[in-house]
Amino acid sequence: MKFSKFYAISTKENPKDATLPSHIFLVKGAFIEQIGSGLYNFLPLGKRVLDKIKNIIKEEMDKAGALEVNLSFNTPAELWKESGRFNVFGKELLRFKDRKENDFVLGPTHEEAMVALIRNKITSYKQLPLHLYQIGLKFRDEARPRFGLLRCREFLMKDGYSFHASEADLDKEFNLMHETYSKILTRLGLDFRAVEADSGAIGGSGSKEFMVLAKNGEDDILLCEHCDYAANIEAAKRTKKTCTDERPEADFATQFHTPNVKTIEELAEFFKINPYYTIKAIAKKAIYESEEKIIVFFIRGDDELQEVKALNAANALELVDVSEEELEKAGLVPGFIGFVGLNGVDFYIDHELENETNMIIGANKKDYHLVGINVVNLNKERFKDLAAVKEHDLCPKCQHKLKQSKGIEVGHIFKLGKKYSQAMNASYLDENGKAQFFTMGCYGMGVSRLVAVAIEASHDEKGCIWNKTLAPFVLDIIVSNIKDIKAMEFAEQIYTHFKDKEILFDDRNERFGVKINDFELMGFPYALVIGKSLENDEVELIHRNTLEKQVLKTQEVISHLEKIL
């Protein structure tokens, strides 16, 4: 492709409100342009990258036996009402009416549409398993779109849905998709980890996220460098904490006067003990579809509450902070809340506290704590995983220290189970002729997001650094002076020889500095610079990842390029 015939007009100014390198460089480098809040056009350079990603995803999904479909971007609201998500999904779900007052949604995901597609058509276990996928537009009405392609409102996504007759068969497909996603990201040249994750609004269990490691990542992940354990901080687990400091000794539930001792730090100082032996109470207001109520979460004093874990324990739509006035109205004593004798309020206790002895906790009485509490003989349903796992906590698999890192989610696979098939009455006949609901899996990958992620993972202060797999062009032929006939003839010779490759011939009537700046900004892997040194039968090859300049003799240019392109 000759640059003079190509549409790629770079800009010098950073886009407004852009903070991430991928957002800045993709806009300045003419890969994308913003047309509205969270809405982007893909320009020819960006479209070439996007198509490469799509093709690799399609190749690997097809190899895995999945079948490609293309579902409508619009989904009748009746399907979302069947699943129960229409009223609970939140404002991110864009709802609208057509001219006949029929309700529709712009799909952020397509579980409902896929179930409707196979419902009453797949009727026998003999037709299972079945895996359908699509690569298409999705829409989420984000309250604060930001970070360019990483958090926009309209995006391209690969979403797949599998249907099975048993959990065991779903497990096989889940493992196959784990392997397939790993192959895709490896082919894309990205440094990634598959991490344990929370299922979020989609629901289900058996959830893994695929995270590309990047210092500007929006997600915190915990990794073990001694085994394969990795988890999103929202779902991370650890080996149970221990402490060798002396425990507080007292008869069971001895009441101590602790005037104005409201915080864990004050409590530990008052009793001269390690906060490990105290129990912290965090009260939240849980928001449900038709009610609100206060729930108290109890964790070890030196831990922090993990909000997503708490949300899952409460099975609520949202958890919000609660005022002291609201606590007092509910009969609670701020700063002195404990679960002993706590009535009329739901509460959960971190599972690591089960069977602990000689602990200190609030007495539900102003200025009093209980010492010598044994966390025993409580309903098992009270105990949930609530504490946030931190760096240097011990790996749940091998007991080595965990390391915290930053990552960007690019894929997510779920075991949905029967959540959607049961809600939408989608069933088949098993080998005994009995109706059974489909067991489902769900597999998503952010296609347009991967364009930005690749640059977050690989850039410098000058611009993008594409690997050869993703680069829109692998080589940029730059003639420093297009009026130099010999230089243009040599460039044309190289261009013609490699015309079947992804070559960009910068034949524009622009200053040399403009061409080099565009090469560095757009980030093609190599540039072949043909300038004054051609008089000495020499040209210069620039490696974009290091900006190293390599002098080549003209007679060796073709053979050298054949090796690297």
Curated annotation (Swiss-Prot):
Domain of life (superkingdom): Bacteria
EC number, UniProt record: 6.1.1.15
GO cellular component terms listed in the entry, alphabetical order: cytosol
SUPFAM superfamilies on file: Class II aaRS ABD-related, Class II aaRS and biotin synthetases, YbaK/ProRS associated domain
Annotated keywords: Aminoacyl-tRNA synthetase, ATP-binding, Cytoplasm, Ligase, Nucleotide-binding, Protein biosynthesis
InterPro entries tied to this protein: aa-tRNA-synt_IIb, aa-tRNA-synth_II, aa-tRNA-synth_II/BPL/LPL, Anticodon-bd, Anticodon-bd_dom_sf, Pro-tRNA-ligase_IIa, Pro-tRNA-synth_IIa_bac-type, Pro-tRNA-Synthase_IIa_type1
Family: Belongs to the class-II aminoacyl-tRNA synthetase family. ProS type 1 subfamily.
Subunit and interaction comment: Homodimer.
Job description of the protein: Catalyzes the attachment of proline to tRNA(Pro) in a two-step reaction: proline is first activated by ATP to form Pro-AMP and then transferred to the acceptor end of tRNA(Pro). As ProRS can inadvertently accommodate and process non-cognate amino acids such as alanine and cysteine, to avoid such errors it has two additional distinct editing activities against alanine. One activity is designated as 'pretransfer' editing and involves the tRNA(Pro)-independent hydrolysis of activated Ala-AMP.
Name recorded for this polypeptide: Proline--tRNA ligase
Organism: Campylobacter lari (strain RM2100 / D67 / ATCC BAA-1060)
Recorded name of the encoding gene: proS
